[in-house]
Regions:
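Terminal targeting and flexible regions in eukaryotic proteins, enriched
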Residues: 1-82, 94, 102-104, 118, ...
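Plant-biased, solvent-exposed loop and capping regions
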Residues: 59, 65-70, 76-77, 87-89, ...
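A generic tandem-repeat structural signature
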Residues: 106, 113-208, 212-215
Length: 364
């Protein structure tokens, strides 16, 4: 009986090879399907176990493509990273996490993920992806996708049709210069947006509608001003290494959730900072290092960490930290960095000790 089954399988193989083109990808696809389409079960007849092939009419079941690993300990994950792949392999329907980073992939065609609607995590970073070679409906049938990693590629624009389910989007270290207003439309679940190290000059109103966004990273771009229409729930804003020279007066007062602001390595001057722009009680950390400041800006007594190193500050003004100095009024500042300025220890007035009594780290 076993001999007849083997003969039948060989006959099928010969028939396939004579009727199909010799294209290597077709042959590889055939081998994959043959390797994984035969699931065997046990049936009992007269207390004797026997193996039987499942019905040939059933569709093939592909547990894992040959190019990847799908470890039994992580049954919903597919690892295809660091394999010199030039295309996205077939993704089985049960997969939720697919890792395709560190390959040579340049193109993503429409339909490549359609078989896996439960995908929640796609890592495609550190490839050679080109915006012109990404289909406009690649992500159209992924209603459960939450995290998408596209950093370290050759993207010149935001891909079309991003799922509204996304919570974490990484597109840093690309060549994106402009972001159309509709790029993130309807993405009300997005909480973290990473756009650092691109060539963005202006975001316009592209961030409107991102009601859940709490982290926005725009480091290393070409921004000349702080983006307008910042989301209301934003708590972390990273703008270092840009070309920003001024700050709007209501920049922080209209965004009570903003806790951490980093504006180092810009072109800020005291003339571009309104008197009370940073004097808001909700701010926890402010980084203004490596700018062109000559005076310490006025800050709230609630601020805990202030970084002002590598500016041109010549004077230590206690009133920048405490409007009134006594036993009941003092700053909550813990960390103050003023090194690489023009202030000397003897320039600090004695009342500064009372004002900054909670500080544990002051660098001059």
């Amino acid at each position: 009986m076993k001999g007849w089954i083997l003969l039948l399988m060989l006959a099928r193989l010969v028939d396939f090879s004579m009727t199909q083109p010799t294209n290597s990808l077709t042959w590889l696809s055939y081998l994959r399907n043959r390797a994984y389409s035969h699931a065997y079960g046990r049936s009992h007849n007269n207390n004797h176990a026997s193996l039987r092939a499942e019905d040939e009419d059933e569709p093939p079941v592909l547990d894992c493509p040959l190019e990847c690993d799908c470890p039994p300990s992580y049954p919903s994950a597919m690892y295809c990273d660091n394999r010199q792949l030039q295309h996205v392999p077939f993704v089985p329907s049960h997969i939720k996490y697919v890792y395709l980073q560190n390959n040579q992939i340049t193109t993503i065609t429409n339909g490549v993920f359609d078989n896996a609607p439960n995908l929640a995590w796609i890592s495609l970073h550190t490839n050679k992806l080109n915006s012109d070679k990404i289909g406009d409906k690649v992500f159209a049938k992924l209603p459960n996708l939450q995290r998408l990693f596209l950093h370290n590629n050759n993207l010149s624009r935001v891909p079309q049709g991003l799922p509204r389910s996304l919570r974490d989007l990484h597109m840093n270290h690309n060549n994106i210069a402009k972001i159309p207003v509709e790029s993130f439309r309807g993405m009300s679940n997005l909480t973290a947006l990473h756009l650092q190290v691109n060539a963005i000059e202006d975001l316009g109103n592209a961030l409107q509608g991102l009601q859940s966004l709490t982290l926005l990273d725009l480091r290393g771009n070409r921004l000349k001003k702080i983006p307008e229409s910042l989301p209301p729930m934003l708590s972390q804003l990273y703008l270092k290494y840009n070309r920003i020279s001024s700050v709007p007066a209501d920049f922080l007062s209209q965004r009570p959730e903003l806790r951490f602001v980093r504006l180092s390595h810009n072109q800020l001057t005291n003339g571009g900072i309104p008197t009370n722009a940073f004097n808001v009680s909700t701010l926890v950390e402010l980084d203004l290092s490596f700018n062109k400041l000559e005076r310490i800006p006025t800050i709230s007594t609630s601020l805990e960490n202030l970084y002002l190193q590598a500016n041109k500050i010549k004077e230590f003004s206690v009133s920048s930290f405490c409007r009134v100095v006594d036993t009941n009024n003092y700053s909550n500042l813990r960390v103050l960095r003023l090194d690489a300025n023009e202030i000397r220890a003897q320039d600090i007035p004695t009342e500064a000790v009372l004002c900054l009594r909670l500080a544990t780290n002051i660098d001059l």
